[in-house]
Amino acid sequence: MAGITTLDIENTTAKTETGKLLLDPFTPDNKLVLVCTKQDDGTESSFWFHHTEMETNDTSEAKRLLQEQLDQTTVLVCHNAQHELIWLWDTGFEYTGPIFDTMLVEYLFQRGQKSPLSLEAVAERWELDNQKMGTLKEQLRKGLSVDQIDKDELEKYCLADVRATQELARGLRKKMFSTEYSSLQNIIELTNTLCVLLATIYYRGFSVDKDALRQVKDEFQKERQGLLMSLEKQVYDLVGDTPINLASPEQLSSIVYSRKPHDKSTWVGNFSKYMKKVDFDLAVKNNSSVVYKTTAISCQDCQGKGYNLYVKKDGTVGKAKRICHTCNHTGIVYIPQKKIAGLKFSAPSANWVANHGFSTNKLSLELLESVARRREMSYAEEFLHNIRRLSALDTYLSSFVEGIETYTKPDQKLHVRLAQHRTTTGRLASDSPNLQNMPRGNTFPIKKVFRSRWPSGKIIEADFAQLEFRAAAFLGNDTLAKNEIETGFDVHSYTAEVITNAGQKTTRQEAKAHTFAPLFGATGYGRTQAEASYYKQFTSKYEGIASWHKDLADEVMATGKVTTPTGRQFAFPDAKRRPQGGITHFTAVKNYPVQSLSTDIVQLTLLLVENNMRKAYLQSVIVNSVHDSIVIDTYPEEEERVKETINNAEQQLREVFLQKFEVDFDVPLVLDFKSGINWMNVV
């Protein structure tokens, strides 16, 4: 028995307090129940490890036989291999060979057109026999644990999954070699190879300092309480006695823009994103009202009680209470004053229209805060800053603090699952919690809760410098961009200079938000006039990138897709030419190649660094990857050797890229690295 083995496992699961399933082996009550395999010669096997119907707890023979199969396996086929691998490893099995993940390969074949990737959904699309049996579904709905489901029924289901996965793998391999999809072969190999490393990172975990986490939580909560007190006073100054819930986008909109729609149900329909400014302003005026500050008085109709007692026909007062509609049961009436409430901002265009009024999202408030700063509207600037900070703190507490508290396992590690199939471009995603959403840089306090697993160890973070810009310079073969990269030209200072010269004083730090935005399809639309001048100048400055953007549009119209140098494909089946010559979906058409090429570089580097560290017999381990960075838990006294390993990977990248994709990436790639006692204090 040897060759390709298709494998599926069944395990028990637990739930968090919020009802989210915990599928991993690091949760104490979770158990491996059953492993089913199928060989290419048709041989099927079932290995039981835990079930309420088992007559013995001795699983040594099952372990021996399964390990024999794994030892003779040349390729392990799974649907969602990370899950299978960590369960095998945690149960004591060894497998370090190649894998073929049918879920990931199907994801790549979707070419950015997302469809569900569960085995059941994929099997249905491929018309394979893999429907969960009715009795099994019913037992799961009743709340039975996997190890309580009828043993024969569970085995039938697991074997059905294995058969479907094997058949799916054969279909996917055949598709790989078709003319239409052949460009994906190299990226499929990279994706499957990386999957094993990401499972390893998941299994290793990232050590969490619980004391530091409590300290950060206390600091966030204290700051939040102070903000709420400040905002309570600011809201009173802005709107008077009107009760305001700042968590309501509708009420926040009325404060920021000092207007309220007449009818929310028809509000959005009054606007078109292509309407002229004069028509937009008129539509706002005709369909919304100015909001005024109010003074609260006791309702005269109910004497401030919020209700009236029922008066009988004979004039006597009954016990029944009737809601006072004058005050809406509050006992208070709010009398409008002559002073307009709120900050009195005007939305610049129909793009700012929202269901509740006008946009109050993060970007909109950030832009308005910038406007307030330039106009020296200090009160508005402070209010908007406080609102944005309050929103950020709420996110930090709910997503990061609570997430880390919930998902840190008994081994005091957060096991970071990096998913390859969640984003359109292949960029890694994570959840439980989503560490990819952490603010960039080394000032975010949450990062200091992540430490080395060794008492004197350090955390090293290696980060690519301006990776997306370098990818775009290569893709557009832009001479000027390449020259700026090679000479170390300060592009952020240049951006600040352009915007400042256009009449809006801008710091280098503020300019960073704009420098590379055009690479991802952003335009000057919705920006200030001075900021828009930079976006216009970007196109004329980087002629190679601009020309490449035009070529992409032509490619999409000719073939319905974009193919990157690494072979990734992105389909745009419904792309159309616009009357003015552009195409629909142009933002995505420009964005996907840059982001996906950057992603492939990072993923190739992850494998290089890991392989180099293993060849050097280092104990240090990769524990995370966020955006364009690699995070390494560094064993004491190995810091310099790890840095040397990173330098070696940087030097090898061009040659490895050429060997892997037959593409000469002729733009220098730079990995900057920092180290510290925790993830935040890396310098």
Where are the predicted features?
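Conserved "right-hand" nucleotidyltransferase catalytic core of DNA-directed polymerases
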Residues: M1-E10, K15-E17, T27-N30, L34-D41, ...
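Polymerase palm active-site segment centered on the conserved acidic dipeptide of motif C
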Residues: L213-E250, F538-W548, E637-V683
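Conserved catalytic core of nucleic-acid polymerases
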Residues: V196, Y203, D301-C324, T330-V333, ...
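Function-dense linear segments that define catalytic or interfacial modules
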Residues: R417-A502
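Short active-site loop/helix that positions an aromatic residue
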Residues: T13, Q82-F93, V105-Q110, L252-P261, ...
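Short hydrophobic beta-strand that contains or immediately precedes a catalytic carboxylate
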Residues: T6-D8, I99-F100, L246, I459-D463, ...
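Catalytic palm subdomain of template-directed nucleic-acid polymerases
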Residues: L108-G112, Q166, T200-R224, A472, ...
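Active-site-proximal helix-loop-helix substrate-binding element of RNase H-like nuclease domains
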Residues: P28-V33, T37-F177, T495-T500, T506
